[in-house]
């Protein structure tokens, strides 16, 4: 799925929640994007990571194409561990702050929220310390992710 499609889908979901008079819940995907932006000091859009390599974005398979893609695999595995603990990582929100050294979890006491916050902060910091290779954006996963 293209990043623009994800934004449209997100906008439709938020609109439907508003139309149903249900207060919109902050979505973890949106929060994770803010954590990423904090970690890289606004140098790269979080959307750049939505379709990178074999693991950044929806799904994931094969061998990561580089260290940045490996960050996404580790993040996927971390969410998998959270799910095994009975958590719903894509739905949970948490308190975090953006300090001079990047994002950090702030006053997160609930087990699941803490786990998800730790997963997201670790991934965002991993993204920030590894090089982004434009050649690994929007790759043919059927050919390169075996």
Curated annotation (Swiss-Prot):
EC number of the protein: 3.1.1.4
Catalysed reactions, as listed in the record: a 1,2-diacyl-sn-glycero-3-phosphocholine + H2O = a 1-acyl-sn-glycero-3-phosphocholine + a fatty acid + H(+)
Catalytic-site annotation from UniProt: 75, 120
Residues making up the propeptide: 20-27
GO molecular function terms noted in the UniProt entry: calcium ion binding; calcium-dependent phospholipase A2 activity; phospholipid binding; toxin activity
Database matches in CDD domains: PLA2c (cd00125)
Annotated disulfide bonds: 38-98, 54-145, 56-72, 71-126, 78-119, 87-112, 105-117
Domain of life: Eukaryota
Xref: SUPFAM superfamilies: Phospholipase A2, PLA2 (SSF48619)
Keywords, sorted A to Z: Calcium, Disulfide bond, Hydrolase, Lipid degradation, Lipid metabolism, Metal-binding, Neurotoxin, Presynaptic neurotoxin, Secreted, Signal, Toxin
Binding residue positions for Ca(2+): 55, 57, 59, 76
Major enzyme class: hydrolase
Example of a GO cellular component annotation carried by this entry: extracellular region
Similarity comment text for this entry: Belongs to the phospholipase A2 family. Group I subfamily. D49 sub-subfamily.
Name of the protein: Basic phospholipase A2 73
